[in-house]
């Protein structure tokens, strides 16, 4: 059963589990569980997608309860009226506040993007980050005898595919557990020493104007058990 974070007569938001596809996809034709279908069965009515989260990413995922509301909300996303914030655990010490303004060329997936144009120019991509916590762990990762990590807040300003993951790789602080853009040695160290295998990227907050009431709505999502375990092992509290 999905954790419902917000629900009214027009919208419903859930805390998407890591590893779960938002909807049926040829990315994995053998998968049988999807957020959309599970939520539909759970609340007893159809839901309409507004935005998406990558399969390995957890956190706030918003759906509309009608196609009309979905269209109104999609306009807010397109016009950048929606504010999103993420938490990520990254390699190394990343402190302070900075903006990453680095255009990204779409990395086409052989399956998901099989019909997409291959020669697209790099697209504008902007991410703000803020370092929140740091830690050094007494086990080796690659050529280093210790492993350093940072907890960071990430705020995307453009909706590019894998933008946060690609931007963190660009600044040499890849997200822990990222099998596509991450550090293989760091991922192995996390798994062997801490038993952590997921992508440590979590959509913790989503703010928007309600399409009917015009109220400012902010929805937050708590961390799952594996995140909580990692935070405890790193001694990161009161985040």
Swiss-Prot record:
InterPro entries: PsdUridine_synth_cat_dom_sf, PsdUridine_synth_RluA-like_CS, PsdUridine_synth_RsuA/RluA, RluA_PseudoU_synthase. GO terms for biological process: enzyme-directed rRNA pseudouridine synthesis; tRNA processing. It comes from the Bacteria. GO terms for molecular function: pseudouridine synthase activity; RNA binding; tRNA pseudouridine(65) synthase activity. Its EC number is 5.4.99.26. Keywords: Isomerase, tRNA processing. Responsible for synthesis of pseudouridine from uracil-65 in transfer RNAs. Belongs to the pseudouridine synthase RluA family. This is tRNA pseudouridine synthase C. It comes from Haemophilus influenzae (strain ATCC 51907 / DSM 11121 / KW20 / Rd). The lineage of its organism: Bacteria, Pseudomonadati, Pseudomonadota, Gammaproteobacteria, Pasteurellales.
């Amino acid at each position: 059963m999905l954790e419902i974070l917000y629900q009214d007569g027009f919208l419903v938001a859930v805390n998407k589990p890591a590893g779960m596809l938002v909807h049926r996809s040829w990315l994995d034709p053998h998968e049988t569980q999807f957020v959309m279908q599970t939520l539909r069965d759970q609340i007893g009515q159809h839901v309409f997608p507004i935005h998406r989260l990558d399969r390995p990413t957890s956190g706030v995922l918003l759906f509309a309860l009608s196609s009309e509301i979905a269209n109104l909300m999609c306009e807010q996303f397109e016009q950048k009226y929606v504010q999103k914030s993420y938490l990520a655990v990254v390699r190394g010490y990343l402190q302070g506040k900075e903006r990453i303004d680095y255009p990204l060329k779409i990395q086409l997936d052989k399956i998901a993007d099989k019909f997409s144009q291959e020669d697209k120019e790099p697209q504008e991509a902007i991410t703000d980050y803020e370092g929140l916590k740091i830690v050094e762990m007494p086990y080796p990762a690659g050529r280093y005898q210790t492993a350093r990590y940072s907890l960071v807040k990430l705020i995307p300003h453009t909706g590019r595919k894998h933008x946060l993951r690609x931007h963190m790789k660009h600044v040499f602080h890849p997200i822990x557990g990222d099998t596509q853009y991450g550090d293989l040695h760091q991922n192995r160290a996390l798994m062997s020493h801490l038993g952590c295998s997921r992508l440590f990227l979590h959509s913790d907050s989503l703010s928007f104007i309600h399409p009917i009431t015009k109220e400012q709505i902010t929805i937050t999502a708590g961390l799952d058990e594996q995140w909580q375990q990692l935070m405890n092992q790193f001694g990161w509290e009161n985040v």
